[in-house]
Amino acid sequence: VRSAGIGAFDGDIASGGALRAVVEHNLDLSGHRATLLTREVANWANLILVMSVTHFMSVTELGAGEVSSLITSFADGREGGVMLESVPDPAGGTEEEYSETFELIRDLVDKVLQRIGPLGYR
């Protein structure tokens, strides 16, 4: 498992809002450093889950559209071109928006984890 972003600056720390949102759940992002999504990273993956349609388009431009899905679509069992809602980006938002986004992502990841075992992703 790797994490990368299309607007990330390599080595950046998580935003203050993200750091505070995870503390409520006894998690720690202080060691997290951003990684820019490159063609090399995209080609390494056998599954890329993105938060928005814009992210999906960027991954497709890197040549990894076939292994990519919007996380909301994948979690709902509708990957393969079906696009559901994007995950809202809380950047610059309120603490409440960061907390709500954390909850949404946590729920989506739980659903994704239930799916990837039977599908044979490793």
Predicted regions, residues:
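Phosphate-binding/catalytic loops
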Residues: 47, 53-122
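Conserved active-site segments centered on acidic
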Residues: 1-45, 114-122
